[in-house]
């Protein structure tokens, strides 16, 4: 629909006779992702007409970086963009202009300027080239951020905190020196561009330094959290063939020390490509030496001996590579087999994160950004990219419910640990999973109240939540608990894009239950099963590179097979046509997502096959989330072998083994014996349908499910009714 017609609708109201005639004869096209709304004099959108509950508006939107960017675009191109919707519409209909302006405004350090941003005529698939001809280094952009207010060498770049009370304040100068020494150690091991360097590490400063040193050489970084079991780690790392592995000696979580090196020893014997293993002394007083083994010739080094390999005179250098050179490998959930290895390039990661930090979130140099995450989750990569915007990055390693006031204090269980850390360190932007905030809400914690925490939280400008949908009641709770001044950014994206589709905006109101806006440069719509755009109706719909020899075909089949030429992300969403906000309804496939942690059923099946094949004939693992549930529950249905009996002892053994081999996050909440596992004609387990049945979403119809043993679906229906 033409912009002037959208203006008419805004002026006269969408329910007026004239507006209805315009909408009938001018239906929106796929490029019309948001209608134009006339702003007030302060740059803010007006009150939505549908009676939505507004919880926050920016007090001075014209002081933000997004407003400055909008004015820069207006001046350069002679536009009169006034609202976020105007800016977003321009960003997706003039993508070359938008990303070129974002490159300039956000500040990308490079040794060669791009020849072309992107071919405007190119479709999403086959994947077009971006910023062709440019050469840069990702680590250089984080260590020497190109921002209007230059950071001081003596300013704090990183604050690393652990559950035991340790505080490590690292200046920009010190961070660069630490990366230099780590890079020198890698050079001694002859690490080259495109080599893979892996971390079996927690969220601490040495992990960040190792990543930056890896990226500085043009090598590729990947990480697996040390709470992941041996099978889970090997399933991922064996595919990428790392040359170098960093590992923690131990981690502290929930008040306990968890040694890591026993698992590390098993992992390295399964990685024939490995040439060296470096042990980081993350927990003092715990084994640090990794004994040699004839099963793996990889060199064993402590972190200090690794650093000592490189000459002290070696300068910090940055290997400049093509803009899309691989930077990170992350992993899919493993729903249909071994987790897929998802490759992310330097410029895509850097541009998306700087856009989201500077424009969408208004993060400024000197702000202090903290997100509770592991190194394996994409939010760690999002967090550490805050350095590129000149922010101080706060790394927290441990349970968010343990707190020690200082390095001399005693760690104790404390539900208000993170709010206390906000006050102690002056954190300005704090983020965690939606489950974390809903847990605080259920426990009725009010950290600023006189009867509880007596905290001020006065430095806090924004709160971010992601991982699963945030309930409207939790929106209200966050404003009650953390203060009316915060921009609540309920954000949504994915490991697949290492970025966000739904983001904050300082030019838009926060509405209870809604993600504020669709991100700039992202043409997001909600499509129905037939490919019809449901965005303007408000109906639910679907939110529309892998490593290895079959990466391109996996990429296409995973994201472009459902709607040819259009990315199908697999999220079930609504778009509010009045506000432009997104409402997340959950996953639209069978991926398990308890407490915001995504993983696949295949990982559970692997453990059962390896450890319980003598007792369990088959199994089905699904997520259950009924209308009244605030989170997804993982349910494991098992079919016993004919001569075997089900018992509670077996269920406990399965839980214990899953916890050890994969992680505590993988442990099913319920393990139930069932008479039969539904399968299709080609033997595929019917997970998605069973998930819908046990969640109360769909009653199985006879003959319509594609299940060869469809009669057994009735058992799942009866179980769901009774439980």
Curated annotation (Swiss-Prot):
Domain of life of the organism encoding this protein: Eukaryota
GO molecular function, one term: ATP binding
Top class in the EC scheme: ligase
GO biological process: terpenoid biosynthetic process; viridicatumtoxin biosynthetic process
Pathway: Secondary metabolite biosynthesis; terpenoid biosynthesis
Keyword terms of this UniProt record: ATP-binding, Ligase, Nucleotide-binding
Enzyme Commission code(s) on record: 6.2.1.-
Biotechnology (record note): Viridicatumtoxin and its derivative, viridicatumtoxin B, exhibit anti-methicillin-resistant Staphylococcus aureus (anti-MRSA) activity. Moreover, viridicatumtoxin and a C2 acetyl analog, spirohexaline, have been demonstrated to inhibit bacterial undecaprenyl diphosphate synthase, a potential new target for antibiotic development.
Function description: Malonamoyl-CoA synthetase; part of the gene cluster that mediates the biosynthesis of viridicatumtoxin, a tetracycline-like fungal meroterpenoid with a unique, fused spirobicyclic ring system. The first step of the pathway is the production of the malonamoyl-CoA starter unit for the polyketide synthase vrtA. The aldolase vrtJ may be involved in the synthesis of the malonamate substrate for malonamoyl-CoA synthetase vrtB. The polyketide synthase vrtA then may utilize the malonamoyl-CoA starter unit, followed by sequential condensation of eight malonyl-CoA units to form the polyketide backbone.
Entry's family note: Belongs to the ATP-dependent AMP-binding enzyme family.
Protein name, as recorded: Malonamoyl-CoA synthetase vrtB
Gene source species: Penicillium aethiopicum
Gene: vrtB
């Amino acid at each position: 629909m033409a912009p002037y017609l959208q203006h008419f609708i805004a002026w006269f109201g969408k329910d007026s006779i004239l507006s209805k005639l315009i909408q009938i004869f001018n239906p929106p096209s796929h490029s019309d992702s948001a209608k134009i709304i006339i702003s007030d004099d302060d740059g803010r959108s007006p009150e939505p007409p549908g009676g939505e509950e507004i919880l926050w508006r920016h007090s001075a939107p014209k002081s933000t970086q997004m407003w400055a960017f909008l004015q820069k675009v207006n001046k350069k191109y002679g536009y009169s963009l006034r609202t976020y919707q105007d800016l977003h519409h321009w960003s997706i209909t003039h993508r070359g202009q938008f990303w070129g302006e974002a490159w300039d405004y956000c500040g990308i350090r490079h040794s060669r300027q791009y020849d072309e941003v992107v071919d405007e005529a190119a479709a999403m698939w086959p994947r077009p080239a971006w910023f062709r001809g440019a050469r840069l280094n990702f680590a250089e952009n984080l260590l020497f951020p190109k921002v209007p207010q230059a950071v001081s060498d003596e300013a704090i770049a990183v604050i690393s905190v652990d559950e035991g009370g340790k505080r490590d304040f690292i200046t920009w100068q010190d961070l660069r020196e630490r990366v230099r020494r780590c890079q020198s150690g890698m050079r001694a091991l002859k690490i080259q561009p495109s080599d893979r360097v892996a971390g079996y590490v927690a969220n601490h400063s040495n992990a960040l330094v190792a990543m930056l040193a890896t990226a500085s050489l043009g090598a590729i970084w990947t990480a697996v959290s040390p709470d992941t079991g041996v099978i889970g780690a090997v399933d991922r790392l064996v595919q990428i063939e790392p040359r170098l592995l960093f590992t923690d000696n131990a981690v502290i979580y929930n008040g306990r020390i968890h040694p890591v090196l026993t698992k590390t020893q098993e992992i390295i014997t399964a990685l024939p490509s490995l040439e060296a293993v470096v042990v980081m002394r993350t927990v003092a007083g715990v084994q640090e030496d990794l004994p040699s083994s004839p099963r793996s010739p990889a060199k064993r080094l402590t972190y200090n001996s690794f650093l000592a390999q490189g000459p002290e005179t070696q300068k910090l250098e940055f290997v400049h590579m093509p803009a899309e050179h691989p930077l990170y490998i992350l992993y899919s959930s493993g729903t249909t087999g071994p987790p897929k290895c998802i490759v992310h390039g330097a410029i895509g990661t850097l541009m998306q994160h700087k856009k989201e930090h500077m424009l969408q979130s208004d993060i400024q140099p000197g702000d202090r950004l903290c997100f509770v995450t592991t190194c394996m989750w994409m939010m760690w990569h999002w967090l550490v990219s805050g350095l590129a915007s000149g922010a101080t990055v706060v790394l927290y390693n441990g349970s968010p419910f343990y707190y020690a006031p200082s390095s001399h204090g005693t760690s104790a269980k404390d539900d208000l640990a993170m709010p206390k850390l906000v006050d102690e360190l002056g954190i300005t932007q704090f983020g965690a999973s939606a489950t974390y905030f809903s847990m605080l809400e259920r426990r009725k914690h009010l950290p600023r109240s006189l009867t509880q925490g007596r905290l001020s939280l006065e430095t806090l400008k924004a709160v971010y939540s992601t991982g699963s949908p945030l309930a409207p009641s939790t929106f209200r709770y966050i404003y009650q608990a953390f203060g009316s001044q915060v921009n609540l950014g309920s954000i949504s994206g994915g490991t697949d894009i290492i970025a966000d589709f739904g983001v904050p905006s300082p030019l838009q109101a926060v509405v209870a239950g809604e993600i504020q806006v669709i991100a700039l440069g992202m043409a997001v719509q909600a499509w129905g099963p037939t490919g019809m755009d449901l965005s303007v109706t408000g109906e639910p719909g679907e939110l529309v590179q892998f490593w290895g020899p079959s990466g391109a075909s996996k990429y296409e089949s995973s994201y472009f097979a459902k709607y040819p030429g259009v990315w199908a992300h697999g999220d079930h969403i609504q778009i509010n046509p009045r506000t432009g906000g997104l409402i997340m309804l959950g996953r639209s496939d069978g991926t398990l997502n308890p407490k915001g942690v995504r993983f696949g059923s295949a990982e559970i099946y692997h453990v059962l096959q390896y450890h319980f094949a003598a007792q369990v004939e088959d199994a089905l693992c699904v997520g259950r989330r009924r209308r009244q549930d605030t989170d997804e529950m993982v349910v494991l249905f098992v079919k016993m072998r004919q001569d075997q009996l089900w018992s509670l002892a077996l269920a406990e053994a399965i839980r214990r083994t899953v916890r050890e081999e994969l992680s505590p996050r993988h442990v099913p909440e319920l393990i139930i014996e069932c008479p039969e596992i539904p399968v299709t004609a080609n033997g595929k387990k019917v997970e998605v349908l069973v998930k819908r049945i046990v969640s109360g979403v769909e009653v199985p119809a006879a003959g319509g499910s594609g299940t060869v043993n469809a009669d057994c679906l009735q058992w799942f229906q009866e179980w769901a009714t009774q439980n």
